[in-house]
Amino acid sequence: GVRSGRLSEADLDRNVRRVLELIVKSPRFKGYEFSNKPDLKAHAAVTRQSAVEGMVLLENNGVLPLASEISRVAVFGTTSYDFIAGGTGSGNVNRAYTVSLLEGLRNAGYAIDAELEKTYTKYIKEETERLNPKSDDPMAMFMPKIRAGEFVPSARLLDKMVRANDVAIITLGRNSGEFLDRKVADFTLTEQESGMIEAVCAAFHK
């Protein structure tokens, strides 16, 4: 410390000053009164604004916004139906509500193909149960669930979707959190994802 000569008084004064400068800027120092009633509507508005500003459209080619005559949508991709609203660990927060992709499309006036939605919902439920068997490990509740792999629709189903809908939307997603290392598939497309994209594009671009 200072008495031993290993730390100068000037360094100590500088560090104390920095701590005090931070304290006087804090809400508590300025008389902030605690309230357990946050303005959730204002928070939601900021979140929406941040989401819009944080999105990056890599390529468009006149696809977006969707043409006014489009009303029926075939939605592909497990993430379209198993929506990722937050992360794992500290990224998993309490939220008043979540607007999923399907809800957002419906709110915008689009009709989601019911048969395709039923097919994906059934697949995701069965795969999630298979990949996440019940465990007696008390730490299991803190671990993120393994998400269902990508569903590759059959040629017959795709042909039906093309005839019943105006456009296809494909969603891919990755969850994120803490204390787990990334794997190759977190950065690249899996074989199932590539197969699904190729199959859907080939069917709808005929």
Name these PLM-found stretches.
Residues 1-7, 41, 45-206:
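C-terminal non-catalytic regions of proteins with extracellular/luminal or membrane-system context
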Residues 1-30:
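Long, well-ordered, tryptophan-enriched scaffold segments
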Residues 27-36, 58-61, 206:
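A structural signal for beta-strand and strand-to-loop patches characteristic of beta-rich domains
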